[in-house]
From Swiss-Prot:
GO terms for cellular component: endoplasmic reticulum; endoplasmic reticulum membrane. The keyword Zinc-finger applies. The gene is TRIM59. Disulfide bonds: none annotated. One of its GO terms (molecular function) is ubiquitin protein ligase activity. Pathway: Protein modification; protein ubiquitination. This is Tripartite motif-containing protein 59. It comes from Homo sapiens. GO terms for biological process: host-mediated suppression of symbiont invasion; innate immune response; negative regulation of canonical NF-kappaB signal transduction; protein ubiquitination. Its EC number is 2.3.2.27. It catalyses: S-ubiquitinyl-[E2 ubiquitin-conjugating enzyme]-L-cysteine + [acceptor protein]-L-lysine = [E2 ubiquitin-conjugating enzyme]-L-cysteine + N(6)-ubiquitinyl-[acceptor protein]-L-lysine. A zinc finger (RING-type) spans 10-60. PROSITE patterns: ZF_BBOX (PS50119), ZF_RING_1 (PS00518), ZF_RING_2 (PS50089).
Length: 403
């Protein structure tokens, strides 16, 4: 098939014949190739101006053609038919030029050391380059691969092999390091997640416990208030029903209403004492946990939450301004006295100082919260007791003055 392709190749452009024209000497060339030769010669005989001489590129014989030029030469219809049929068929064993459609690579460019087609030589980037036919170029380059291979010595091969092994070892070592880091990441975040999950459960458990304390504090009071309200509703219903009774029935039951009302009036309503939860989890998370290092989270203790009566300002009955001023001053004196006593205890108690100095930062924070809570509750109770005592003392003094 390759030899057959050579028969269909123009000897001038080394491409498949395009519009093949046959000369009187029986040699065939492309029409464009003959026109290029004719234009390049430019020789016209003066004595025979109506004939144009053309020298055959193969046999060098001169042919006189009509003034119409190459168009006057006959077309090689047989060759053109063969070419058309050849181009319609697929030839997978024939390598064609990637730049020129369906043009076979049948010439070897000596300058660029690559196969080219006829169009590459005439109109392409290889125009004017030295060329050689395939067979001749093959014979010249046949021993080239072996000669090039001989340039690679045994030492080079050994070095290359050792380098490959070294690269494989480094790659394996790096992959082991990466795998170890992956396992470390998984283990670290698993432990961190377990710690956070445990802390979360501890917080939720503590909140549930303080929620139970809230229920124990308020639910009985609410039930008692509901009971009193039900009694009052029953009394209101009884009062409405009496309006429809006869005078006799009315007088019999009105005393019952009077007694029930008297009982309800004498039954004191409990004072609503608000409570507060201490410490607040939201404040702990915002102020302490947000500043805690990740590695120290497992060492942070969950505080025990409690409820205590909400601290209220001490109120004084009476409308006399002098009395109020006196009691305010007395209140300041009492608070100052209590503060001095507590500061003295903290200053002179060596055991407390030793305890605070030996405790760690985390334990100190937790202990401080507990101490502050206990101290606050104690101060509040002492203050309320003193207020009550001074209130009774004031009542006693005013009664004596009144008499």
């Amino acid at each position: 098939m390759h030899n057959f392709e050579e028969e269909l190749t123009c000897p001038i452009c080394y491409s498949i014949f395009e519009d093949p024209r046959v000369l009187p000497c029986s040699h065939t060339f492309c029409r464009n190739c003959l026109e290029n030769i004719l234009q390049a010669s430019g020789n016209f005989y003066i004595w025979r101006p109506l004939r144009i001489p053309l020298k055959c590129p193969n046999c060098r014989s001169i042919t006189e053609i009509a003034p119409t030029g190459i168009e006057s030469l006959p077309v090689n219809f047989a060759l053109r038919a063969i070419i058309e049929k050849y181009q319609q068929e697929d030839h997978p064993d024939i390598v064609t030029c990637p730049e020129h459609y369906r043009q076979p690579l049948n010439v070897y460019c000596l300058l660029d050391k690559k196969l080219v087609c006829g169009h590459c030589l005439t109109i392409g980037q290889h125009h004017g380059h030295p060329i050689d036919d395939l067979q001749s170029a093959y014979l010249k380059e046949k021993d080239t691969p072996q000669k090039l291979l001989e340039q690679l010595t045994d030492t080079h091969w050994t070095d290359l092999t050792h380098l490959i092994e070294k690269l494989k070892e480094q790659k394996s070592h790096s992959e082991k390091m990466i795998q170890g880091d992956k396992e470390a990441v998984l283990q670290y975040f698993k432990e961190l997640n377990d710690t956070l999950e445990q802390k979360k459960k501890s917080f939720l458990t503590a909140l549930c416990d303080v929620g139970n304390l809230i229920n124990q504090e308020y639910t009985p009071q609410i039930e008692r208030m509901k009971e009193i309200r039900e009694q009052q509703l029953e009394l209101m219903a009884l009062t409405i029903s009496l309006q429809e009774e006869s005078p006799l029935k009315f007088l019999e039951k009105v005393d019952d209403v009077r007694q029930h009302v008297q009982i309800l009036k004498q039954r004191p309503l409990p004072e609503v004492q608000p409570v507060e939860i201490y410490p607040r989890v939201s404040k702990i998370l915002k102020e302490e946990w947000s500043r805690t290092e990740i590695g120290q989270i497992k060492n942070v203790l969950i505080p025990k939450m409690k409820i205590s009566p909400k601290r209220m300002s001490c109120s004084w009955p009476g409308k006399d301004e002098k009395e109020v001023e006196f009691l305010k001053i007395l209140n300041i004196v009492v608070v100052t006295l209590i503060s001095v006593i507590l500061m003295s205890i903290l200053f002179f108690n060596q055991h407390i100082i030793t305890f605070l100095s030996e405790i760690t930062l985390i334990w100190f924070s937790e202990a401080s919260l507990s101490v502050y809570q206990s101290l606050s509750n104690s101060l509040h109770k002492v203050k309320n007791i003193l207020c009550h005592i001074f209130y009774l003392l004031k009542e006693f003094v005013w009664k004596i003055v009144s008499h």
